[in-house]
Structures are given as C-alpha cells and as structure tokens.
C-alpha cells in the first residue's frame, strides 16, 4: 500500500511540475509575442522601404502608380528610378503623398546617413542648379519646364514649351512628383 501511495504522490507532483513548465512556456511565448508587437510598432514604413532592394510599386495620393527601385530615401522625399516607355526615368516623390506601396519586405533599416535629413527643397535645388527639364505633377495637373527657384514651401517652374515662358508657383503641399522630362 505504501508503494502505491508513493506512486500516486509521484504522479501528482510530476503532474504539478508539468503544469508549471507549461505555464512558464506559455508565459515566455506571450512575452516574446508582446516584445515582437512592441518592436513592430516602432518600425516606420520608410525604414522598411530603405531596407528593400528590389522593385516596388508606389501608389500616389491621386491614384498614379510608379514602379521602380528606390535610389535614395530621405526623411521627406524619395528618388525612384523607374522604367518607362522612354527607358529609365527618375522621379522625386514627397513621402507625404505616398498612398501605398507594394513590394516591401518585413526587414527595416533605420536612417543613419546625414543626407537622409536633407529636405525636399534641397533635392529640388539640385535639379534647379542642373537646369534639368522636368515634369512637375501636382494635385491639379502637370507642368513641363525648368525649376527657376525653390523657396521654403514652394518651387517656381518656368514653362518653356510655350510661345512666351510662363512662371508657375507650385506649393510643396500640391506637389505629387517631379520627374525627368
């Protein structure tokens, strides 16, 4: 009788140990899941875009879709190298007008380069210095010309394909993209 009682107690304590181990494992899994969710909550979509090496599909707020590879990503704008009917075309796109992206991986890469902090105006001034012919797409249409001036919150585009050049002011808030023309 003593031996069967010891067996019963051994089984009882073994069961308690198994329950405790299962509870601890569930607690660890819950903690890992919570840490994973907290880590994912801190990831910005631009950091995921920065880590992406392949082609992406960028949907703009007006419904236009651009496809290509990200050549540069700053905090407020990106340079997208896209294939088109005329070959490779480069676009400068404010990140604020991106409505969606297809092709992002799950990896993220935080901004570490000082150039990532350069504003949209800096990128546009580089195009102005080069006297590049650009297509400026806005929320109300598009203009082809050269960037004449870049202010704190706007750019001036001189439409050169007209009998008389027209100087158009485009607020950054209306800008969807600036592309090679």
Predicted regions mapped to residue ranges:
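Short glycine-rich, low-complexity segments
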Residues: 1-67, 71-144, 148-181
């Amino acid at each position: 009788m003593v031996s069967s009682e010891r067996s019963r107690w051994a089984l009882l304590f073994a069961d308690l140990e198994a329950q405790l181990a299962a509870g601890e494992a569930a607690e660890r899994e819950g903690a890992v899941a919570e840490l994973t969710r907290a880590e994912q909550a801190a990831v910005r979509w631009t950091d995921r875009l920065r880590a992406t090496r392949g082609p992406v599909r960028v949907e703009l707020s007006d419904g236009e879709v651009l496809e290509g590879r990200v050549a540069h990503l700053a905090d407020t704008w990106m340079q997208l190298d896209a294939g088109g009917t005329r070959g490779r075309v480069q676009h400068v796109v404010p990140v604020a007008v991106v409505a969606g992206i297809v092709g992002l991986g799950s990896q993220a890469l935080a901004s570490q380069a000082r150039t990532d902090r350069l504003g949209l105006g800096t990128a546009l001034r580089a195009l102005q210095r080069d006297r590049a012919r650009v297509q400026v797409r806005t929320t109300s249409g598009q203009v082809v010309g050269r960037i004449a001036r870049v202010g704190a919150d706007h750019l001036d585009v001189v439409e050169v394909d007209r009998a008389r050049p027209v100087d158009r002011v485009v607020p950054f808030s209306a800008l969807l993209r600036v592309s090679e023309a």
